Amino acid sequence: AMAANSNLKRVADQGFGQSLLDSTIRIGDGKVGDIQQKFAMLHLDPARPRNSRTHGLDEMAPTLPEIFEAWKDKLNHGDRGPAILLDLSPRLDNSQRIEVEEIVETFWPNIGKTWVWTSRGKGRVDRLSLWIGQLSSPNVQRRFVRIPPDIKEKPLVIEGDIEEISEHR
């Protein structure tokens, strides 16, 4: 959260103007507390054990349902619902991603969702995130972003929908 705050400050300093500088950035453990303010976006990076082999959803603290319950009435809604960005373990398998989607659906039925895998190469996925509601891309369920070694080059972005090609696997 501290890094996100610092990154937003850097973005604001590069010309995004006073509106970003006037924004409230709340850093904490995911529990809202007694506040009356509504928020435009929730960026959640739940704590996970560093040396875990399973990267199960039950290892996140606090859990996604706890956080969504705390925040659901504190988020502004646009025409596609609230703006939520979940940073998750890149090791989540398909069944765990489906479980995350089911949890999201219990709080915001039929909301748009875009899964984003990000890699810097060397055969590994560095980040996995779920962009929800206002942050999701309509008609794009999955996106892969390959960041090149030279930051002056544009990243490779591949987008598409889910299409099962086999029941096996």
Regions found by a protein language model. Name each.
Residues 2-38:
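S-adenosyl-L-methionine
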Residues 34, 38-39, 43, 48-169:
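Class I S-adenosyl-L-methionine
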